[in-house]
A protein has these predicted regions:
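Vicinal oxygen chelate
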Residues: 1-6, 97-136
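Short, conserved charged micro-motifs
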Residues: 22, 94-98
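Conserved beta-strand in the GNAT
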Residues: 63-66, 128-129
Length: 136
């Protein structure tokens, strides 16, 4: 698989997931994030609380993947109150096309490059978008 393209903005997003290990593997393999810290049931948190803090090496964007004790395993839905989607900015239409190809290589279904946007979903059905500003 080719090396991951770049992001430009967003510092940290905390996402509730059903399986922090599975999600951290996906965010690493598909988007190129790296694990900074993991907490799987340490004494600092309840034993059923899992947390993985990840960082993208180029942009410095951080995500937290958190499995909460009260999560009953239901998939994400943007139709409930809370997060609708996460949008990451890329530098150019060319970089957006590189991302489309990378998603294809990883077997991740996506919208294809529509104008200046590609949308896809993570293992918990959270919608992610890659966007580049149109030339002015």
């Amino acid at each position: 698989m080719t090396s991951p393209p770049t992001f430009e903005r967003v510092m940290y997003v905390g996402l509730s997931v059903t399986d922090a290990r599975r999600s951290s593997a996906w965010y690493a393999d598909v988007l190129g994030f790296e694990v900074e810290r993991e907490n799987f049931g340490s004494t600092a948190r309840p034993s059923d609380w899992d947390e993985v803090l990840m960082r993208h090496p180029h942009s410095g964007i951080r995500i937290g993947l958190l499995r909460h004790p009260s999560n009953n395993g239901a998939p994400f839905s943007e139709f409930r109150t809370g997060l609708d989607h996460v949008e990451l900015e890329v530098a150019s239409p060319r970089e957006l096309e590189r991302w489309r190809r990378r998603l294809d290589e990883a077997g991740v279904p996506h919208s294809g490059a529509r104008d200046y946007l590609v949308t896809f979903r993570d293992p918990d059905n959270i919608q992610l978008e890659l966007f580049c500003e149109p030339a002015r």
